[in-house]
Each structure stands twice: as structure tokens, then as C-alpha cells.
């Protein structure tokens, strides 16, 4: 079985090199040769651990999907500023994928009754940090698009037409608005919540690693961050490499969301 998968992969690589396979078909072929896929994703954070995360991913030959917002960083700027632009460009060159996390890390708080749809939104970054206000669907879409456009500008790579709402806080109306402007929401699996936002006093890295290795299942979308201000004992890189190695030993393989069956058609049509 393994040799058959290798032969199939080699054939597609040759076809890709010759220009006879389009990227979407390549993604489907890769997914077909991966029997136990998981989809590791990272949301932005203070970025203090970002170089270490990149080192682990490169060493383990793992591609991931990053969801980016312009969040405050330990370098006194934001995670999409010029200081971090080379870091993002390097991740693109390695074959990682990108999506929006809303530019201002904008939390949905509630729907506003009436038409057209509008929402109570509270950003945790940018000039309106901590201030709740009403946004129209167009304003919310513009904030999603602003992050995507910035990623494209600094990486030279078109981000996926996907986004992750901060905190996973959404409503049907909010998701419909986002899809209406070309962005499909991506959450995460219950077992895929890797726990790096939890207090390290109660949830040690050892405990989180054991829990993840015991509960993650094929097809799960996994969630971690590029630095959490409140966690005293950082989850990465302490848990990241052991998690990747442990999942590989269990027969799992890592794929980006470009290859996820729930999003392939959406990506191809947008």
C-alpha cells in the first residue's frame, strides 16, 4: 500500500512538473494518498514564538494554514507590520497557506435586528481596540478582506478564501455575510483545540500533549496560536514538535486546508 501511494505521488509530481495537473487536482491527489489527515492551523498572537514554530514546521516538513490578524506583538508593532513581513514571506515560500482572522481581530458580540444585516463587533486590535460598535455586513467584510489583502501584499501569494472569526464567535447571519463577500468560515474540532490559551497552572504542557495525542482523530482541524500573552509556560515549541512526531507515529499526515474536503470546492470556485 505504501509503495503504491509513493508511485501515485511520483506520477502526479511528474505531471505537475509538465504542466498537465492543475494545483486543485494536485491537492485532491495528495489528500487521496493520505489516509489519516489532520489540518494544523495557527492563529496570530504576540508572535514571540513564531520563529520557533517555523523552525519546527520546517524540520518536520509540515505545512499548515495560518489565520492572520494585525494583533499587538512583543516587538511593539502588529503581526502584519513590516517587521514581520519577511517571516510571512518565508512561510509562503515553504508552501504554507493563509487565511484572514479579520484585520482588527474583531469579535462578534451580537446580531442587530433589522435589515440590512448588521452586527455588534468588538475589536481587540487596531484603533477601535476594546470598543464595541455596530458594523454593517460590508464593514465586516472589509475587515476580513483587509487582512487577506495585506497577506497577499507581503507574501506574494493569494490567501485562501477562508477566514476564522476570533474566538470562534459567530452567528448564522454573520457567516452568511462573510460568504456573501467570498469568505467561508473555518472552525476547529473539539479535540483539535490544543489548549495553548488555557492557564498553564491548571493545564500543563504535558497534560495538553497527552490529551491531544489521545483524542485527535482523522479529519480534525487543529488550532494553536503564535503566542498567548496570558500563558506563562508557552505551549510551543514545547508541545508542538512532540505532537507532530507523536501523530506521525500514529499514522497521521498533515495537510493544509486547501486539501480539506469541506473547503476544496469553495476554494476552487473563489
Predicted features by range, described:
Residues 98-105, 168-170, 223-226:
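Histidine-centered catalytic micro-motifs
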Residues 28-33, 64, 74, 232-270:
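C-terminal domain-boundary segment and adjacent tail
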Residues 1-12:
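Bacterial N-terminal signal peptides that target proteins for export
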Residues 10-20:
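Bacterial N-terminal signal peptides
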Residues 28-135, 143-161:
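Active-site beta->alpha N-cap acidic-glycine motif
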Residues 22-27:
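Sec/Tat signal peptide C-region and signal peptidase I cleavage site
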Residues 169-215, 252-263:
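His/Asp/Glu-enriched short active-site or ligand-binding loop at hydrolase and phosphoryl-transfer sites
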Residues 44-49, 70-83, 106-111, 162-172, ...:
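Acidic-and-aromatic substrate-binding clefts and catalytic sites of carbohydrate-active enzymes
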